[in-house]
């Protein structure tokens, strides 16, 4: 699958919130850079950490916690 398709699938998992997607990808990419193992079958030496993070989100391997939505 192309990166654009993976990004679109990951975005849908986060209810089309680009800001949340950017935060989750950045945090997970940082974890991967610091030695965390990928939760999907991708080689860390071949793929960028951000691409691995997108794949993980798209395949429901990563869930977003810690955001609380309030009603106005």
Curated annotation (Swiss-Prot):
- Give the enzyme's EC designation: 2.7.7.6
User: InterPro entries from the entry?
Assistant: DNA-dir_RNA_pol_omega (IPR003716), Pol_omega/Rpo6/RPB6 (IPR006110), RPB6/omega-like_sf (IPR036161)
Q: Which reaction does it catalyse?
A: RNA(n) + a ribonucleoside 5'-triphosphate = RNA(n+1) + diphosphate
Q: Cross-referenced Pfam families, in alphabetical order?
A: RNA_pol_Rpb6
Q: Which UniProt keywords apply?
A: DNA-directed RNA polymerase, Nucleotidyltransferase, Transcription, Transferase
The GO biological-process annotations, alphabetized, read as: DNA-templated transcription
Main EC class the enzyme belongs to: transferase
List all disulphide bridges recorded for this chain: none
Return the HAMAP family for the record: RNApol_bact_RpoZ
Family recorded in the similarity comment: Belongs to the RNA polymerase subunit omega family.
Function, as annotated, reads:
Promotes RNA polymerase assembly. Latches the N- and C-terminal regions of the beta' subunit thereby facilitating its interaction with the beta and alpha subunits.
| Assembly and binders | The RNAP catalytic core consists of 2 alpha, 1 beta, 1 beta' and 1 omega subunit. When a sigma factor is associated with the core the holoenzyme is formed, which can initiate transcription.
The name under which this protein is listed is DNA-directed RNA polymerase subunit omega
Per the UniProt record, the source organism is Campylobacter lari (strain RM2100 / D67 / ATCC BAA-1060)
From the UniProt record, report the name of the gene that encodes this protein.
Answer: rpoZ
